[in-house]
């Protein structure tokens, strides 16, 4: 309820600062060809995300038919709309998968790996975008960007060694505590993915493509609304906007994510009305992309399935 209230409060603040009627008119006036292109990119995004999920399910060795694996992903994505953004869909997916396989720790670990690779690729893309936007002639920026990319990569790699880090830095007296036992089992399950470097490489590549597709979606929406900002700037700022949408401080990314995108487009001269229209369309498309999961969910409920 707190996050729902925060989303409403942030939307109310945006409404007090920006003409919402003008924003609605701007959104409705979007070029149809650009809108259809953005919809197509959302479909590509979902297909790539589902492919990544199926790779994880197969590697985890879960006794789950392809149809059920697809069902878990789509329904989990839909149920995540009613939970805090970012972690909501992950939590729902882990819960549904655990119920279907009776492998709770492995389910949570698989979802955590999926999310961590997504965040890593997002951070890496932001660094690349920063370099492209500010120009390659700045040697200091290039060095700092390479250092930042290396730091992000090392930090992401440490996640896969969480089991070893726990054993090294957690006091032995905590070993008998129930929460530590659960944390250790989860860390071991995540650490097991170290044995599959080719899988991690494929998943990381898919994650990078997904993030580029999402940035391209925002770019296409902006072009369709009539403001022209270089794609290199989208590569620099949109990963931050996507992260704001994913943070568990709002429902579905409404309010906070929109406000961040509006603020990030101001330095390049985009009017607030247009940037709010773009961010609203972007968030709405994300919500609407979960409709297949909604249909599967209600169909299962009508049949008495879980």
Residue ranges and their predicted role:
Residues 1-2, 113-122, 209:
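Select subsegments of transmembrane alpha-helices in polytopic membrane proteins
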Residues 76-85, 237-258:
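Transmembrane alpha-helix interface/packing and boundary motifs in multi-pass membrane proteins
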């Amino acid at each position: 309820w707190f996050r729902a209230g925060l989303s409403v409060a942030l939307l109310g603040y945006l409404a007090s600062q920006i003409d919402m009627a003008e924003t609605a008119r701007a959104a409705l006036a979007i070029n149809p060809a650009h809108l259809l292109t953005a919809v197509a990119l959302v479909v590509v995004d979902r297909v790539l995300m589902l492919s990544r999920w199926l790779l994880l399910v197969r590697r985890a060795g879960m006794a789950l038919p392809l149809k059920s694996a697809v069902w878990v992903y789509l329904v989990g994505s839909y149920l995540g709309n009613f939970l805090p953004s970012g972690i909501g869909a992950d939590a729902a997916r882990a819960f549904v998968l655990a119920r279907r396989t009776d492998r709770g720790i492995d389910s949570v670990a698989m979802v955590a790996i999926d999310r961590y690779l997504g965040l890593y690729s997002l951070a890496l893309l932001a660094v690349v975008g920063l370099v492209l936007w500010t120009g390659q002639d700045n040697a200091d920026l290039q060095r700092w960007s390479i250092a930042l990319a290396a730091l992000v990569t090392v930090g992401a790699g440490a996640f896969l060694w969480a089991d070893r880090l726990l054993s090294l830095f957690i006091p032995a007296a905590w070993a008998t505590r129930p929460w530590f036992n659960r944390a250790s089992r989860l860390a071991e399950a995540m650490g097991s993915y170290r044995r599959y470097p080719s899988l991690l490489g494929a998943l990381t590549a898919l994650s990078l493509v997904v993030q580029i597709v999402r940035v391209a979606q925002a770019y296409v929406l902006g072009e369709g609304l009539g403001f022209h900002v270089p794609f290199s700037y989208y590569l620099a700022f949109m990963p931050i906007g996507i992260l704001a949408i994913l943070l568990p401080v709002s429902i579905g990314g409404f309010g906070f994510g929109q406000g961040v995108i509006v603020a990030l487009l101001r330095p390049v001269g985009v009017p607030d009305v247009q940037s709010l229209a773009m961010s609203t369309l972007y968030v709405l498309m994300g919500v609407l992309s979960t409709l297949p999961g909604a249909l599967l969910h209600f169909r299962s409920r009508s049949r008495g399935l879980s």
